[in-house]
């Protein structure tokens, strides 16, 4: 078989700057020249080498380089995060675990994961053009509550760092998968950014639009469009505004819109195990089918920060919200494997979140060689999720949850190089389930009417760690942390066999993570890190 595979990226970059100074590099690049970046995902701002945890930082330069050849979040994380599974090259991230377990995905601290009914799309919820850097904290943790049994992935969006009154960038790129399929293999991307600072006000506006060509394998055959990345149109818009109320007080607003839909002339052709693969062929899709993908994902926050609100104490408060609508692939009625009362259909997930976070950060200074950093506060999250069919029927009813959580994180530093960390978080989650009827697989199946009610979860999670940083070439740490998850509760409820909520098994998963590792920095030219971990839970973390 003759194999052919080509990829042709072409990129043009333009810059708009103030007349006083020409711009020779991305304004964000200078930030990445710092040898060690301060991370915030651990809730205590700190260098990753003394965080007593395995942390990976994917900086702006790495993201920009990857975006030229693979502007897809799943591929980027899989290739640049040790311990994370590679992308499946589909829209689904179900198999893309972190240390073998699911991770909690955040955008500027806003949860993208949908625990009441998983979309398996939480990684693909923002375009790479809007991202400044990504912080990955590996291992079970409850720093942000439910869902991080494999770790945390916090996607930090861009903001202006130039100080110029106005600057900008425009990029245009094109690609093709196969020169012999040019009519269907071509794709393109357009990205425009404007940013600047005027007095006390700073701003950044970023817009991106792209289309991928039809996915083609090395032999020139179309890949099946089911859950495919081919023929996908993606739109992203980011707005970030900041205002300095005073030298110590700041107000910041962020809004991000993301859409990714597949519009293809291909239809899937089923394969046969060990004989022929599933492929894509030209054809007309079912008239009942609509374009699959994420129709919208809105994320927004308003944040107030104050340094030295009172003696040696900073304060941060934020309110945030998100709204998501994802549509899955169309399933034609199959008598051998019936669902939805034996009919064709297309399911979706609708998810809405609203929450707030308040935290104080206090420094207790005992001497030059002994001080403690305390972070304490309260988190609240309201979450509402349903899984309807596009035709209006409900496969899973609207579930609502309220999550209240006080927390405390401490970090004590002795002799400037020994760090001892301890943290605790108490989560109280109340999930409200309405009365509902199970959508049967066949009309001849017995009807199941479930009496709704409340599911209550109480969880206390602890973390403790010690790191030693006196010798840059060898900076070891040991750590223990706990996480918990009520992963995909709706999937259990939609297939209920019992008519009373209390008879349905909905136990949460609690994980324990033990870890020993080290960071090494040899004269700033060679940086190494490694760890050994053991994670355990009594219950499985997937269905």
Give the location of each predicted region:
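N-terminal periplasmic "start-of-domain" segments of outer-membrane beta-barrel proteins
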Residues: 33-68, 152
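Short acidic/polar hinge/loop motifs at secondary-structure boundaries
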Residues: 110-138, 192
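A beta-strand signature from Gram-negative outer-membrane beta-barrel systems
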Residues: 128-169
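Transmembrane beta-barrel wall of Gram-negative outer-membrane proteins
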Residues: 183-213, 217-265, 362, 366-368, ...
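Flexible loop and strand-edge segments within Gram-negative outer membrane beta-barrel domains
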Residues: 212-216, 224, 228-236, 244, ...
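Surface-exposed extracellular loop regions of Gram-negative outer-membrane beta-barrel proteins
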Residues: 261-263, 267-275, 382-386, 428-447, ...
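Signature of Gram-negative outer-membrane beta-barrel scaffolds
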Residues: 374-471, 486
